[in-house]
Structures are given as C-alpha cells and as structure tokens.
Amino acid sequence: RSVIDASGTPQGSNTPRFYDDRIARYFLYPLGHPVNEMEYTHTVINNGRFNLRESHEPISNDFLKRNFKNGSKGTLLRIDDEWRFTSDDGNARQSRNADWAYKDTGNPIAYHSEWLMRSRESDYDYGSFIELTRMLDESKTDEATLNRITNPDMLALNAVVRGYDADWDTITVDRGKNAYFYRPKDGDGWMLLHWDGDRVFDRNNQAILGGRRGVNTYFNRPFIRRRMNYYMTKLLDEHTKASARTLAWMDAETAAVSGSGINMTKSHYTNWFNRREGIARNFITSNVANTSFAVTTPQAPTSKDVITLE
C-alpha cells in the first residue's frame, strides 16, 4: 500500500516544490527519529495519462513493525480536526483544531473524533492519552511524570524539525492536525510521527512553537525546552546552513532526478537556511530555558565529607 503525493505538480494544491516533505524526513532520520519511506513514481490509471507523483509508505502496521518492537500492538492515533454538524442535512458544520486539552471526562467519545484510533481499534483504549491531557490540565507536569507518559526526546526532536521548517499546518506549530501520535506497547511513551509536511519553507517569521492548549504547556516545560535546544543546535550545526552533508545530499538528489521532470530546488532551501538561522538561534537562547546555573541552598558551613545538593 502507498499514499500518493502530488506536491511539485500542477495538481499539488498550492504545494509547489517536490522536496519539501522529503527534506523534513531527511532532517529527522539522522537525528534518530523513525520516518516512513518514499519514492518518486510515474502513475497511470486505466487509459489516463502518466502522472509524476511521490509514493509514501503509510503510517500503519508495516511501518510500525519495521520501526518498533511489537509495533502494531502499540496505540496509534491520527490527528485531525474535530467536526460538529449542526444541521440534519450536513451542510452546516463547525470545526476546531485538535489539541491536548482535557475535556473534563474520561469518556473516549469526547476525544475520538480528532484523535482517530488507527491500531487496535477493537480495544478502543484511550486511557493513556486521556491521562496525559488530564496531567497537563492539572499542571502535574513534573519531569518524572512526563517522562513516564511521553517520550520527551522524540517529541522534542519532532517539534524542532517541524518548527524550523515553519510547518504551520501541524499540531506543534499552528494547526491541530497532520501528524500521528503513537505509544509503543513496550518501552517509551507517546511520540509524534511525521506526516503531511508539505506546507513548509515559506513563512520566514513563523514561530517555532504554537499555542495549542496542552501542547504549549508540554513543550514550554524547562526540561522539554532543554531537549528542544539540544536538537535545534544539532540541526543547525550539522544539517542546515553551510552543512557539507546536506549540500552533498541535495547535489546527489539533483543528479539522480535529472531529466525526470522532478526539480530539486536547492537554492530555495539554502536561502531558507540563511533566513531561518536567526529565529532558530533566538529560540535556543531565549531566557525561558537558559537560566544561569546557581546554587541557592543556604550557605552554611559543613564538616561532612560528602553533601547532597537538592
């Protein structure tokens, strides 16, 4: 099975470049984040014309089994808008962005329209997800609690890459959709999986993080921001502006697709690296997560050979 992407073609729905979504995966993979596979293809349906498309591996059981132990036995949620139909004919409707808001109930019906179960559907188990939203709502966000429920490194890395790309159409930046939320059966807690990152590399001044309820609470905890600072530094120092590796990769891609109708718009991305550098560096050096180290315990003398600082 595969999902077909028309980015870079006239049918691409205002997604004008072939490599936008692919570069995000290129950033994530060497930094240790699992990503799905993709390849460019020519597709034809019946007696229609050939169309140039990118075929994406779907985020489903095969992907989960390849990347995680007992992967298909984990809990996979697809993130999308919550819709409310307010007329019998369905023509009047309202929508809201998905977020990590606790809805004052443990009933999964309150959550399942924007957090769509995509594995173990018959179990219909939203317990761990609802626990996360409740903890965020009640400000029970100490490091031990969040480390138990989530995978802070993978969440921080995912948010860094999508924020750097100005991927406004996803939950950590501006829109409550276009990602998957996954909790492995064995091992670490909840993490985001990259999906549908084709509206990127355009909004120069887009903030790295958005303000979705619960999401903002999580990522602004100092120990989460510390991880984001680490991954943003790695991204900037090793994979973006003046990165020999990334430039070589783009040159190799340019050669590989020559004559195929696919364009690797290298100059657009190198210009982005230059323009985005300042905002990304400022994100790292903001005061919220860069407080100077200080020992604030009472300055009383001690005769002990070993003391514990708390």
Indicate residue ranges for each PLM-predicted region:
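Alpha-helical scaffold elements adjacent to nucleotide-binding pockets in ATP/GTP-utilizing enzyme cores
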Residues: 23, 55-59, 227
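Internal "kinase-insert"/substrate-recognition segments embedded within catalytic cores
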Residues: 2-11, 17, 30-36, 48-165, ...
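Middle-to-C-terminal accessory/interaction subdomains
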Residues: 13, 111-306
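Alpha-glucan (starch/glycogen) binding determinants
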Residues: 310
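Short, well-structured active-site flanking segments
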Residues: 36-37, 174
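TRNA-binding/sensing appendages of the translation machinery
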Residues: 16-17, 21-28
